From Swiss-Prot:
The gene is aqpZ2. A motif (NPA 1) lies at residues 63-65. The record marks C20 as: Involved in tetramerization or stability of the tetramer. The keyword Cell membrane applies. It catalyses: H2O(in) = H2O(out). HAMAP family: Aquaporin_Z (MF_01146). It comes from Rhizobium meliloti (strain 1021). This is Aquaporin Z 2. PANTHER family: AQUAPORIN TRANSPORTER, MIP17260P. A motif (NPA 2) lies at residues 184-186. Homotetramer. The chain crosses the membrane at residues 9-29, 32-52, 82-102, 129-149, 158-178, 200-220. SUPFAM superfamilies: Aquaporin-like.
Length: 232
């Protein structure tokens, strides 16, 4: 179990460093900013690369919502859920701390949103709480459906990380304007701790919505995809 938790810690750490790091450090860098498209691909690439790297050790969740959805679908033992979530949140916090140290090394650095998730006046596009809630539930739901389907034993081996990485990229392309895209409570927690204030007060949504969407996906998969469940 220790090796699995280390893998989840490292994977989540890389996701936040690569994804949130691109948003904080490179999204609007003078003249060569990567923009929304670049940030979206950065998040997808972090999952793709780490899924190939440590997926064989822990399953490559890097996300409390993914762990919950897989547990509800019967893919992983529920007993490991709490340990996985702790490792994931710890990885996200450490990565956010490293990113903060790097970002504050710039003379004119301003914290701003620090890639934190938000709704209302803290939504990149000014979207309401309801819009943010629906977006996070729906996007996490489909993210889990894609994960559950692409990791099935009847699907050609070795391609799941590609499908999952591209799915996360697409999710970010759609939802960055709405919430700055969470679908991952650990990723949201790490950034919110350093922003404080409004980010912490709105953090509840970025736990409840992804976990709810993931749980529904697990239930749906057990019903719709029951015949395709892999052999343990």
């Amino acid at each position: 179990m220790f090796k699995k938790l280390c893998a989840e810690f490292l994977g989540t750490c890389w996701l936040v460093l690569g994804g949130c790091g691109s948003a904080v450090l490179a999204s609007a860098f003078p003249q060569v900013g990567i923009g929304l498209l670049g940030v979206s691909f950065a998040f997808g690439l972090t999952v793709l690369t780490m899924a190939y790297t440590v997926g064989g050790i822990s399953g490559g969740h890097f996300n409390p919502a993914v762990s919950l959805g897989l547990a509800v679908a019967g893919r992983v033992p529920a007993a490991s859920l709490v340990s996985y979530v702790i490792a994931q949140v710890a990885g996200a916090i450490i990565a956010a701390a490293v990113l903060y140290v790097i970002a504050t090394g710039k003379a004119d650095f301003q914290l701003g949103s620090f890639a934190a998730n938000g709704y209302g006046e803290h939504s990149p596009g000014g979207y309401s709480l309801t819009a943010a809630l629906v977006t996070e539930v729906v996007m996490t739901f489909f993210f889990l459906i894609i994960i559950l389907g692409s990791t099935h034993r009847r699907v050609p081996a070795g391609f799941a990380p590609i499908a999952i990485g591209l799915a996360l990229t697409l999710i970010h392309l759609v939802s960055i304007p709405v919430t700055n895209t969470s679908v991952n409570p650990a990723r949201s927690t790490g950034q919110a701790l350093f922003v404080g204030g409004w980010a912490l007060s709105q953090l509840w949504l970025f736990w409840i919505a992804p976990l709810f969407g993931a749980a529904i996906a697990g239930i749906v998969w057990k019903s719709v995809g029951e015949e395709f469940r892999p052999v343990d």
